[in-house]
Each structure stands twice: as structure tokens, then as C-alpha cells.
Amino acid sequence: MIRKAFVMQVNADAHEEYQRRHNPIWPELEAVLKSHGAHHYAIYLDQERNLLFATVEIESEERWNAVASTDVCQRWWKHMRDVMPANPDNSPVSAELKEVFYLQ
């Protein structure tokens, strides 16, 4: 498994709405993530700084990257763009984080 972590932002007035939209996520989005090899996906909120910290284990970078081109992912990004900063393609503005420590 490949461990990934990344950070995103959420609008200051949208914390509750962001959480509501993820509980639960769309069943078809969950199915796409799982079918593309995503496991143990978690998102944490830093309320003071409006930051979202996400971790996920993936089976391959290629399969993970392919999620972005699915119809359901494109619809999800469009659905979420009003609660968080988004790129021109509606994907969330994000930055990948470098792992510096891991205890198994």
C-alpha cells in the first residue's frame, strides 16, 4: 500500500456543511474510490485555520489518479466547489504532504 496525505481548505462558514455532505458520501463515489484501490480514507478538520488534512492508502498512483476522470468524481467536485477553494476544473485546491515519520 502507498500512504498519501494532503491538505485542502474549507470556507470558514462551511465547516458544518462540508461535514454534512460527507456523512455519508454518495454511495457511487464510495464505490469508485474502493474500485480504484483507495482504503482507510480519512479527512480531519482544523477549525481554527479552516484546513482539511486527508490521509488515504492506495494500491497504485495510476488507479488513484484515474478517479479524477470519472463522472462521479467530476460531479462531486462540482457539488463541493461552493464550500471550499477550487481549481478551474472544480477539483479542490490541495497540496500533497511529505511523510516524515511513520510508526507501524
From Swiss-Prot:
GO molecular function: L-rhamnose mutarotase activity; racemase and epimerase activity, acting on carbohydrates and derivatives
Enzyme category, top tier: isomerase
Enzyme Commission number(s) of this protein: 5.1.3.32
GO biological process: rhamnose catabolic process
Pathway info: Carbohydrate metabolism; L-rhamnose metabolism
Binding positions (substrate): 18, 41, 76-77
Family annotation (SUPFAM superfamilies): Dimeric alpha+beta barrel
Classification via InterPro entries: Dimeric_a/b-barrel (IPR011008), L-rhamnose_mutarotase (IPR013448), Rham/fucose_mutarotase (IPR008000)
GO cellular component: cytoplasm
Localization per Swiss-Prot or TrEMBL: Cytoplasm
Gene3D superfamilies attached to this UniProt entry: 3.30.70.100
Source domain of life: Bacteria
Catalytic activity as recorded in UniProt: alpha-L-rhamnose = beta-L-rhamnose
Active site: 22 (proton donor)
Entry keywords, A to Z: Carbohydrate metabolism, Cytoplasm, Isomerase, Rhamnose metabolism
Major localization class: cytoplasm
Primary role: Involved in the anomeric conversion of L-rhamnose.
Protein family per UniProt: Belongs to the rhamnose mutarotase family.
Oligomeric and partner information: Homodimer.
Name of this chain's protein: L-rhamnose mutarotase
Gene this protein is translated from: rhaM
